[in-house]
Amino acid sequence: MNKLIGILEDDEGIRDILQFLLLEEGYEVECYTTVNNFLTKKDSNPDLFILDVMLPDGNGLEVCKMLKSSPKTSAIPVIMMSAHADLQQMNSACRAEEFVKKPFDIFAMLEKIVQLLNKDNPLAH
């Protein structure tokens, strides 16, 4: 079974590019445009989350804190991304594994995703 990646991003362009690239790489992808939309998908169990910080109905940092404090999701890697936030401030606000400043190099992002998904199995994917 392919790895599932959950993307919480309100910017359609960024969301579509990430989704297209990840699907091309063989991953399954679920996209969410708002915090509320994300929170209603409790049945989903992604292998990695990519979260934007600034969202129309909330804050990705708060979502990250929630994910990292839940026993069900605390071990799932999180990549935070933002065009505006200070990366050091983001690091102290939640326990995400990676922080990416927008705009970002899509291939560097893919490399981070592969590393996080395969950190326990370097020969996977």
Model segments located where?
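Two-component/phosphorelay signaling modules centered on CheY-like receiver
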Residues: 11-30
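C-terminal output helix
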Residues: 104-115
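Active-site residues of response regulator receiver
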Residues: 52
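Acidic catalytic/metal-coordinating carboxylates
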Residues: 34, 59-62
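Alpha4 helix (beta4-alpha4-beta5 surface) of REC/receiver domains from two-component response regulators
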Residues: 62, 84-101, 111
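Hydrophobic/aromatic residues positioned on beta-strands within the core alpha/beta folds
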Residues: 79-81
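The feature encodes the CheY-like receiver
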Residues: 56
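Acidic, metal-coordinating helix/loop segments flanking the phosphotransfer/catalytic sites
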Residues: 31-48
